[in-house]
A protein has these predicted regions:
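Non-heme di-metal
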Residues: 2-285
Length: 285
């Protein structure tokens, strides 16, 4: 099932509300349009020219985001194995990263729109609008680097596993925060330094610089996740660490496995007591 097309009213000009802007971003099929809408919506929110707004029966968040015709989306198990060496390997790495960032755009703006009904401080939306804007800029950065290498997003197949995390947590804000920033983005903190080192060793300083920007921003995204997870847990009178572990066991479809970048995670507020008890434990492991 594909996302319904956004209306012209939703995509032309400034959004009527933050929720309307978030919905239009998720529904847009063209990645460049997602980036444009994310920029304009984030700017309007920062300038305090948008109300929060609300979803309605007729205008709810879609079950699936808008997507271009390419790349072909495959189940993760059907993805072809690719060499990590040479120019083709770097293009494959960047293409995979572009796909991750496009999903991050949709997952973040879906969080903003879907959970606007929650009684949260305005600073909560300030943080996640900022994250949504940065995810869009990450996609744009990686796309430009792919173009410099003679490639583009859509040239290779991609897997459809990431959006499943959004679908699995659409019922719960605290579950969404547990899985997306505190599992998926935290994993980026684990793997990015080695990828940056590998690109530098291959002489691809430009691609390494792109990953460096993303890595630094991911630290902030995980920090936002840790802050708001604690806020929600403590508001409900629950201890954050065991609650996190329970939510991951219920809602995440894979193992939590080392190696971990413990220092970066801790700097972002995600201390080992959250994730070490989950090592090699997954919903279907």
């Amino acid at each position: 099932m594909t996302a319904p097309a956004a209306t012209q009213e939703e995509t032309d000009g400034p959004p009527r509300s933050l929720v309307a802007g978030a919905r239009a971003i998720v529904m847009a099929r063209d990645p460049a349009e997602k980036v444009r809408l994310a920029r304009s919506t984030a700017r309007a929110w920062r300038e305090r020219t948008l109300s929060l707004g609300a979803l309605s029966v007729e205008h709810g968040m879609p079950d699936r985001p808008g997507r271009p015709d390419r790349p072909v989306l495959l189940p993760p198990r059907d993805m072809p194995r690719r060499s990590s060496h040479g120019a083709r390997g770097r293009i494959a790495l960047l293409h995979s990263l572009a796909h991750i960032e496009l999903n991050a755009v949709d997952m973040t703006w879906d969080l903003v729109g879907r959970f606007a009904r929650e009684p949260m401080p305005r600073s909560f939306f300030d943080d996640w609008v900022g994250v949504g804007h940065e995810e869009a800029e990450h996609f744009a950065l990686v796309s430009r680097r792919l173009a410099e290498l003679g490639a583009g997003y859509g040239d290779l197949p991609a897997h459809d596993g990431l959006w499943q995390a959004a679908q699995a947590t659409g019922h719960s804000l605290i579950a969404r925060i547990a899985i997306v920033p505190l599992v998926l983005e935290a994993r980026g903190l684990d793997v990015s330094p080695a990828m940056i080192t590998s690109l530098e060793a291959a002489g691809d300083q430009a691609s390494a610089a792109v990953l460096g920007v993303i890595y630094r921003d991911e630290m902030r995204h995980v920090a936002h996740g840790a802050k708001w997870f604690r806020f929600l847990a403590e508001r409900d009178g629950q201890a954050p660490e065991p609650l996190f572990q329970s939510l991951v066991r219920q809602n995440f479809r894979g193992p939590i496995k080392p190696p971990f970048n413990d220092r970066a995670r801790a700097e972002a507020g995600l201390t080992p007591g959250f994730y070490k008890p989950l090592v090699a434990v997954g919903r279907f492991s």
